[in-house]
Amino acid sequence: MNALGVPPAYMLALGKQHGVPVGALVGTKQHAVKQAEAGVDILIVSGTEAGGHCGEVSTMVLVPEVAEAVASFKDVSILAAGGIVTGRQMAAAMAMGAHGVWTGSVWLTTIESETSPIIKEKLLAAASNQTVRSKSRTGKYSRQ
């Protein structure tokens, strides 16, 4: 999985040589096309609702844009990311053209997670409007 630009050609070649799919996070349809042209196997289409570094386009808008933009790349899978927690949200993403979803924050609340109990409680009690985007950690916007 690559999060910073197009993976180097040698990495893509190694993945293919060993049967390991290569994925990349994308926040715009233009980035998705560049990744597909480079030979990436899986596009993690990360909307503004996604945790961590995310783009400016919402998941609901971005997924169908990317699905249409890369439709000619038959071997590229699309995973929707950003604000997906329930089966209904997963079904909606798939109805918009995703082949599946990439979830993140929801796993912090599982029994298996090493997240502290206090943080788990806060995550589960939080409302959907209680996340923020900030540059405080890396200088680039990140959902926290």
Indicate residue ranges for each PLM-predicted region.
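Conserved active-site-proximal phosphate/metal-binding subdomains
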Residues: E56-L79, V85-Q144
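Conserved acidic functional residues
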Residues: L25, G82-G83
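Active-site entrance/lid segments in N-terminal catalytic domains of soluble metabolic enzymes
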Residues: M1-K74
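Glycine-rich Rossmann-fold phosphate-binding loop(s) that bind the pyrophosphate
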Residues: L4, A81-G82
